[in-house]
Regions:
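Intrinsically disordered, compositionally biased charged tails
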Residues: 1-2, 244
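Composition-driven recognition of glycine/serine/threonine/acidic- and proline-rich low-complexity segments
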Residues: 3-14, 18-233
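Intrinsically disordered, low-complexity repeat regions enriched in Pro/Gln/Gly/Tyr
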Residues: 212-265
């Protein structure tokens, strides 16, 4: 019996993420959501701030016990570059506020019942937000990433829900990434992203591999040059540095949404 339990424990550890992988997932989510925040700002014309993510492990019972009821589950499936899906969870009121703002309202029309119009609007918002996040992910993984149109559903966690019908990975343990989201003075709330653990590992491995390739490229570029190639290499080096400077500037602007900088509302 002891041997079996030890084996189970080892198997469980293999299924979970290491601390390094959790950090990597947090950084991936941070950059992706930063890009998504910029897109949401353009849709609602209000200041959008999304906080640094908190990465943890969770299961369906934890979600039912801790999150507001009812809520909206938005499934994002990857069609190119990654194999899998993740789920974004928003509170019902937040969906109503975003939908009202998208339709030209002031964000206070939240009394009516959540219906197909809200779900259609939030699906379109998430299509644009997660599409821009996929573009950021493409840069991090150095390959094309694409998604299918997100599908939004109302889920009342007070009722008995077959989580397997929402997505099979919800029947076991999964990665939960929590963000604080602020939209002007209308929303100060928590949103969640739920990832299957194998999918999270795949993203981490992709980022690590891309970083290794970048490191090898830098090492090759930094090798000493001798002979008559010195002058030519000096010219090449100075021109090669220009894109790097541009990339740094792009990185700085890319970080702005994470800090809530796109403030024109």
């Amino acid at each position: 019996l002891n041997d079996d339990s030890g084996s189970d424990s080892s198997d469980k550890n293999d299924r979970l993420l290491t601390d390094e992988e959790k950090d990597a997932i947090g950084e991936i989510a941070n950059i992706s959501m930063g890009t998504a925040a910029t897109t949401l700002f353009s849709l609602v014309n209000r200041r959008v701030e999304i906080s640094t993510p908190v990465v943890s492990f969770s299961n369906w019972d934890d979600i039912v016990a801790s999150y507001e009821k009812p809520c909206v589950f938005i499934k994002i499936a990857y069609t190119v570059g990654l194999d899998g899906s993740n789920i974004l969870v928003l509170k019902e009121r937040d969906v109503k506020v975003i939908t009202d703002l998208m339709m030209g309202g002031d964000g206070t029309n939240t009394d009516e019942e959540l219906g197909e119009l809200h779900l259609s609007a939030i699906s379109e918002a998430m299509n644009q937000m997660m599409g821009s996040a996929a573009t950021s992910l493409s840069s991090m993984l150095n390959k094309t990433i694409d998604i299918s149109p997100p599908v939004a559903d109302i889920v009342d966690l007070k009722e008995t829900v077959d989580e397997g019908q929402i997505d099979e990975f919800l029947t076991g343990e999964f990665v939960k990434i929590s963000f604080r989201m602020e939209i002007g003075d209308l929303v100060d709330s928590e949103i969640m992203q739920l990832y299957p653990i194998p999918f999270a590992k795949e993203m981490c491995q992709g980022v690590s591999k891309n970083m290794e390739l970048d490191s090898e490229s830098i090492t090759e570029d930094s090798k000493p040059i001798s002979g008559n190639n010195a002058a030519a290499s000096q010219t090449n080096t100075s021109s090669a540095q220009q894109p790097n400077m541009g990339a740094m500037n792009m990185g700085q602007s890319g970080q702005q949404p994470m800090m809530g900088q796109p403030m024109m509302g």
